[in-house]
Curated annotation (Swiss-Prot):
GO terms for molecular function: phosphoribosylanthranilate isomerase activity. Pfam families: PRAI. Pathway: Amino-acid biosynthesis; L-tryptophan biosynthesis; L-tryptophan from chorismate: step 3/5. Belongs to the TrpF family. It comes from the Bacteria. Keywords: Amino-acid biosynthesis, Aromatic amino acid biosynthesis, Isomerase, Tryptophan biosynthesis. This is N-(5'-phosphoribosyl)anthranilate isomerase. The gene is trpF. The keyword Isomerase applies. GO terms for biological process: L-tryptophan biosynthetic process. SUPFAM superfamilies: Ribulose-phoshate binding barrel (SSF51366). Its EC number is 5.3.1.24. It comes from Xanthomonas euvesicatoria pv. vesicatoria (strain 85-10). It catalyses: N-(5-phospho-beta-D-ribosyl)anthranilate = 1-(2-carboxyphenylamino)-1-deoxy-D-ribulose 5-phosphate.
Length: 222
């Protein structure tokens, strides 16, 4: 397949500064993510995210990330921030995830413990989350948070998925080209790979990351 006919979507997650969000829009990033998971160093309050949301460019999705938050907390974020997409990293089931009447992504932990001790299985995932807009495969272990800066073995990705998937976990400008060529994801999700410190993005790393994604898109796979 000629990658010039395909565009990998890009999501920058863990945003905490309006200036970083504006730069993401200028770079053509498809989505920015705010983290509301307890214990995350990138966690922001709903009011902070609402203020930063004003910096998003037109046609850029605003993603709200949760990990075992209560239904009331998710509802407050939906009401206050007005995200266009939800992302769940905990033990939330499909009924919970779809109860907010917004499209959602379900994160799948691919850390050393795998998914319940086993590799992810496409059929099981799709039966468990029939209403998800897509899956996100990250390197964290079950019950842990993302943004670890660690990769996982990409050969363990399940085959036969009928939903789009995003690749996350330790992706940066140095390896995103190889990651895309190896796995052909719908999109890539990066946080620590474009940071100086948790939540503090680096403009040079952001630009370089986008350049490498576009280079991969132009790579001839034939």
């Amino acid at each position: 397949m000629n990658r010039s006919l395909y565009r990998t979507r890009i999501k920058f997650c863990g945003m905490t500064r309006a200036g970083d969000i504006r730069l993401a829009g200028e770079l053509g990033v498809d989505a920015v993510g705010f983290i509301f998971a307890h214990g995350s160093p990138r966690r922001v309050a709903p009011a902070e995210a609402r203020a930063m949301r004003q910096a998003t460019a037109p046609m850029v999705d605003v993603v709200a990330l949760f990990r075992n938050n209560s239904k009331e907390e998710v509802r407050e974020v939906v009401r206050t921030v007005r995200p266009t997409l939800l992302q769940f990293h905990g033990e939330e089931d499909d009924a919970f995830c779809r109860s907010f009447n917004l499209p959602y992504l379900k994160a799948v932990p691919m850390g050393s413990s795998g998914v319940n001790g086993e590799d992810a299985n496409a059929r099981t995932l799709q039966l468990s989350y029939p209403n998800t807009a897509g899956f996100l495969f990250d390197s964290h272990a079950p019950g842990a948070g993302g943004g670890t800066g660690k990769t996982f073995d990409w050969s363990r990705l399940p085959t036969g998925l009928h939903r789009p998937f995003l690749l996350a976990g330790g992706i940066n400008a140095d390896n995103v080209f190889d990651a895309i060529v190896a796995t052909l994801p719908w999109g890539v999700d990066v946080s620590s790979g474009v940071e100086l410190a948790p939540g503090i993005k680096d403009g040079h790393k952001m630009r370089k990351f986008v350049e490498e994604v576009r280079r991969a898109d132009c790579h001839d796979m034939s």
